[in-house]
């Protein structure tokens, strides 16, 4: 019995060592399996992708401003309202604009009459020149006869002197009338009535007054939704002052900020999978890299950091990457500027360019609402000219 009792501790020690070795082997095996699984997961699912959650929706916020000063009379749209290009958003009091327009019409009528009067003045001066030419010819004829009589001693010297003075006076009158005629002809320059400088100035003033009257109605430059309205009825607005913004849901993009270490294989044209926090992980959207900014976000900030100090700490910088979105995907799931998103870029194909290539000049955005049909004012101008000319 004593011998059996002395053998049990040794057996238990060997058994414990064996169990520990087995446990350690199992643990190491599990670590290897986890490591291999992670490596395989990285190779098949992560190697060809770069992902960031630092991504936000950007878009064009078209600021609506006034081109003329005035007081707000009407506001026709509020925040979140759908508007179309050309819709009247704000109306200014047009009393002063109408008065200026009426004054400009009167000024054009007066300018036409003055030019017409100038034409009659030229005709009168032409007649005066002709009359003075006749007077000079008569005076010269009288002087020639008196020269012959003076040689014969038939007239006195005083009559002869008067004849000479009459010729000089006729010459002076003729020169004066010619100068007056030339001065008035210089004002007309033998050009059509409408092209006269005085009338052109009056026409331009009338068009400007008409344009200012049209601009008292402030229109939406694009299709979109009203945002950031800060104008109030009765408010005095100045030229260029922001009244509200119009945001187009077709002019949006994603601004994704990637770490500089993630840009090594990132190229323009690479596909992007996007999840917006608004619609959750189950709703996936497509995008394409449209460009990579020429500087980090910190470099373009209002107060960029200064690293020329003794307490420098290296911080990984982030570079904005613009991702083009497909507007057709957002007809039923619209976006809002500033929404958060997660962007995952497939970088397996890195044959594209990192910088945009030079392209032919083109118009990216435009509006026709700032142009006005001038046919009405042109007809008005022609009517005023015809009514005040012979």
From Swiss-Prot:
Coiled-coil blocks: 160-190
Single Gene Ontology BP annotation: xenobiotic detoxification by transmembrane export across the plasma membrane
UniProtKB keywords: Antibiotic resistance, Cell inner membrane, Cell membrane, Coiled coil, Membrane, Transmembrane, Transmembrane helix, Transport
Membrane spanning stretches: 26-46
Compartment list: Cell inner membrane
UniProt topological domain (Periplasmic) ranges: 47-390
Domain of life: Bacteria
Keyword flag Membrane: yes
Record membrane topology: Single-pass membrane protein
Cytoplasmic side stretches: 1-25
Pfam families assigned to the protein according to its UniProt record, in alphabetical order: CusB_dom_1, HlyD_D23
Cellular component per GO, a single term: plasma membrane
GO molecular function: bile acid transmembrane transporter activity; xenobiotic transmembrane transporter activity
Family in the record: Belongs to the membrane fusion protein (MFP) (TC 8.A.1) family.
NCBIfam families: 8a0101
Function: Confers resistance to antibiotics.
Name of the featured protein: Multidrug export protein EmrA
Organism: Haemophilus influenzae (strain ATCC 51907 / DSM 11121 / KW20 / Rd)
